[in-house]
Amino acid sequence: MANKTILFNKHLESNAKMVDFHGWDMPLNYGSQIEEHNAVRQDAGMFDVSHMTVVDVIGNDACAFLRKLLANDVAKLKVPGKALYGGMLDENAGVIDDLITYYLTDTNYRVVVNSATREKDLAWIAKQSQGFDVTVTERPELAMIAVQGPNAKAKAAAVLSAEQNAAIEGMKPFFGKQAGSLFIATTGYTGEAGYEIIVPEDEAQAMWQALLDQGVKPCGLGARDTLRLEAGMNLYGLDMDETINPLAANMGWTIAWEPSDRDFIGRKALETLRDAGTDKLVGLVMEEKGVLRHDMPVFFTDSAGVEHQGVITSGTFSPTLGYSIAMARVPNSIGDTAEVEMRKKRVAVRVVAPNFVRNGKQAF
């Protein structure tokens, strides 16, 4: 029996096509994935992300524990509400999950992890927390709605109270703040401005309806995937997993090497990999007809005339750009051109940084 979010009936009211997503009944689309995608790029769309796992880490050792658990360093967080993206690694430097951590106080942090990895993550966090003065509490009674797009903040403001709007006024990107019963964060998975709103389950349906009434378009997993890929954001299980280290997943910027005595889990293995050199995650652009897809092989010849092979991790048609884009893991000697094998022939592609669209505009 699949899990259902508190908004399941609201999806049915909007004629959603429901699919199983890692054990959750979730909307794939509400009729047109392209229209939903474009709404987020041009106006405002919203996603039910209540399947995500919210975990509060509280206690005298909360900071010390998270500094060991995560490859990024929560000690960098000094301003209440500031958020940090990073990886949780195993001893071999494989990525157990990527997650966002919000700093509330020195003894209170909120972590949001992926739904597909929930049980694995919670077990790992519980195991690693032994010996630390921390309490790790999952918050299943909280739903989450992501409102994204150039008009998302204005439309969200119309459904928030005066006090809630005052609480989040002027909030910078990548922050979260408690505003009455809501936890409102300037984060997202689309490359657009907006909010991710953590809301008590008993208020979630009314909030969803209020946003609908403001003209915010409901969007499903299909549009969520094309939007995040245009924004060059990783999807766990495709672009990285426990067999992949963060240096090979365009997550090098999320590793806090300093201070050098911070012994986070996976550090020694990661230092060895760093010194030896790893593959890297790049962007591919194909302006010919056709669509780049997961698992297609990528070929290139280096400056010494040696052929190398990589693989596409995520690929799609980009509605914003009008042609296909992909992320691919390849040897780091790649230049600015390559070939992808599709339909038994090789097609030329451009190699770019894995970031295709930001704020509705081409980013490469």
Curated annotation (Swiss-Prot):
Reactions catalysed, as given in the entry: N(6)-[(R)-S(8)-aminomethyldihydrolipoyl]-L-lysyl-[protein] + (6S)-5,6,7,8-tetrahydrofolate = N(6)-[(R)-dihydrolipoyl]-L-lysyl-[protein] + (6R)-5,10-methylene-5,6,7,8-tetrahydrofolate + NH4(+)
GO molecular function, one term: transaminase activity
Listed GO biological process terms: glycine decarboxylation via glycine cleavage system
Record EC number: 2.1.2.10
Uppermost EC category: transferase
UniProt keyword list: Aminotransferase, Transferase
GO cellular component: cytosol; glycine cleavage complex
UniProt entry tagged with the keyword DNA repair: no
Family affiliation: Belongs to the GcvT family.
Function text: The glycine cleavage system catalyzes the degradation of glycine.
Subunit (UniProt): The glycine cleavage system is composed of four proteins: P, T, L and H.
Annotated protein name in UniProt: Aminomethyltransferase
UniProt organism field: Shewanella baltica (strain OS195)
Taxonomic placement: Bacteria, Pseudomonadati, Pseudomonadota, Gammaproteobacteria, Alteromonadales
